[in-house]
Regions:
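A short, structured loop/turn motif at beta-sheet edges
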Residues: 16-17, 64-71, 95-104
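Hydrophobic pocket/interface hotspot
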Residues: 19-20, 29, 48, 63, ...
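Short, charged/polar surface micro-motifs in flexible loops or helix N-caps
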Residues: 54-57, 65-72, 78-80
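Short beta-edge strand/loop motif at the mouth of beta-sheet-based domains
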Residues: 7-8, 14, 27-60, 147-153
Length: 153
């Protein structure tokens, strides 16, 4: 079966623990991810939601695997756009590997569907979000483009 996949690798001057917190804790995500935050208990098998600033659920799914501070796997479905939601669930994997004074972050977002609209969308969004995360951890300042939820969404 054909699938769609987006892979992004970056190196961030931080510790695995700090990067893990930045990926999972609302006080961090709101700073670099357009004011969004996760709602979950961060236990395997539990529900996961990505909340947007007005309280709507942007994306939802389940925590599939969690190995703090090394690996996080989420089942992920868009909740905003009916045609994207209809594609069903994707899988998003974060791998954190210490590399001296840095951490190698590998993100793989994939779906068992050829030419997935969701994977097309996240391939546009993840580079900006993860660049802003890197900037926040290395300089203390997120990128301006990701500080606020886009108007009209």
């Amino acid at each position: 079966m054909a699938k769609s996949e987006f892979v992004y690798v970056t190196y961030i001057r931080t510790t695995p623990e700090r990067l893990w917190d930045a990926l999972t804790q609302p006080e961090f995500t709101r700073a670099y991810w357009c004011e969004c935050w996760h709602e979950t208990t961060w236990e395997a098998g539990t529900a996961w939601k990505l909340m947007v600033p007005d309280g709507r659920v942007g994306d939802s799914g389940e925590v599939v695997e969690i190995d703090k501070p090394r690996r996080l796997v989420l089942q992920w479905r868009n909740e905003f756009l009916p045609e994207v939601q209809a594609e069903g669930f994707s899988r998003c994997t974060f791998e954190l590997e210490p590399q001296g004074s840095m951490v190698k972050l590998t993100l793989v977002h994939e779906m068992e569907k050829a030419e997935s609209k969701l994977i097309g969308m996240v391939s546009q969004g993840w580079p900006t979000i993860l660049s802003s995360l890197k900037s926040l951890l290395e300089t203390g300042e997120a990128l301006e483009a990701t500080k606020h939820w886009p108007k009209g969404m």
